[in-house]
Amino acid sequence: MELTAGVTTELSGAEITLRCLQEEGVEIMFGYPGGAVLPLYDEIFKQEKVKHILVRHEQAAVHAADAYARSTEKVGVVLVTSGPGVTNAVTGIATAYMDSIPVVIISGQVPTHAIGQDAFQEVDAVGVTRPCVKHNFLVKDVKDLAVTMKKAFYLAATGRPGPVLVDIPKDVQTAKTNFFYPQSVSMRSYNPVVKGHSGQIRKALQLLLEAKRPMVYTGGGVVLGNAAAELLQLVHTLGFPCTNTLMGLGGYPATDPQFVGMLGMHGTYEANMAMQTCDVLLAIGARFDDRVIGNPKHFFQEERKIIHVDIDPSSISKRVRVDVPIVGDVREVLQEMSRQLAAGKERPDPVALKTWWDQIGAWRGRDCLKYDRNSKIIKPQSVVEKLYELTKDMDMYVTSDVGQHQMWAAQFYKFNKPRRWINSGGLGTMGVGLPYALGVQLAHPHATVACVTGEASIQMCIQELSTAKQYRLPVKI
């Protein structure tokens, strides 16, 4: 590891932790106190740069930090105590992990001399969270604390983002050492590829230009990779149909005529038919989830060439065989695609494209999302449509719980911007909606935040209404 110059001062481990957060530009953290983190809480109250939000349950702390990260491009931060504090947080951590959200979780731990002795409120935080974090650390020496915190933020935010846990024993929090915060870290075992291979990009473009029935399939990676503008430019240049997954909504504007709707088991007929019958498929920041393609064996009954762009090499050819893999940051790859396309004169066959769009138009004609608009009973679909009409010109964010209401929100609210739709797609965690709304509202105090929820989901984290009241957060439910 290489370190660059920082600042040197003798501080306690708790002071170092707070200084690290300040160095990373953290403004808000979510947490719940306990015995193993009291030194940290003592330091929180001595400073004003990092605001602490007291939730009513550790699960909600992680959900709120998760939503804060989703809506801001920043890393969410959580502070929990040892034992039940960590175990309560696991559902939130797993939710963030499945959706690739950058969150740093700081957990207290029993003193180092008591680890492994079944001490009061002792839990193996590293072992418990190993399956649902991008990485985790147990800090046994205060001298390692600052660089570990730097690593945690670096790992959480780069490559394929994800939650990182830092477990800090109580005696490490009280021990003192010189504070040196590195401005950067370099780890030989971790080196995410950013730029896609130019040869693979050329090969992909050739396939796309020769396609008769092309399709662009995008997921949450476009949103997380801040590649919405680059995607729109490429799709408009090519003239291809584009679809988003549940996690990708907003990555391509829903009101654009080339958008064929959401994909998957709750998606539109035209999006699914185009996906199943295309001859060249460009997948960007998506992972061919079972809710999108179903059984991979059935998906391959039709012949097609697949191009897959993703920052995570382990996602490529994981569920389906890929013809042209491109590992890299989706924004960088899309920019290079547009550059190469602009440099050449070749364009897709307009006659073949018209025939393809005519077929898609016929599928659209089925109006698969229609419902009885004359019913005397208020339909949920109508409620979501009305919400969109009332708020489409506002600075608006929509959070959702998990269930049928989530799908109605995804189907009938037209998301034209990224990071405006906050929901649990991978783990499908009921109860996220309200704490998500709190996290978004704190991140965007002047925006309007609405939580679409169901009668069961709202009860799973309903105690967070108290948090909303305490901090005067005007979320709409």
Which residues fall in each region the model found?
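Active-site diphosphate/adenylate-binding microenvironment
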Residues: 14-18, 22-27, 40-44, 358-435, ...
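Glycine-rich, anion-gripping cofactor-binding loops and their flanking helix/strand elements
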Residues: 70, 220-307, 416-447, 459-463
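Conformationally flexible catalytic loops at phosphate/diphosphate-handling active centers
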Residues: 155-210, 368-369
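Glycine-rich phosphate/diphosphate-binding loops that line cofactor/substrate pockets in enzymes
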Residues: 15-26, 67-73, 97, 155-160, ...
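Phosphate/pyrophosphate-binding active-site segments
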Residues: 1-8, 143, 206, 303, ...
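A short, small-residue-rich loop immediately preceding and capping a beta-strand
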Residues: 21, 27-30, 50-53, 71-110, ...
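Conserved thiamine diphosphate
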Residues: 120-159, 277-278, 324-325, 333, ...
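Thiamine diphosphate
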Residues: 106, 114-121, 272, 277, ...
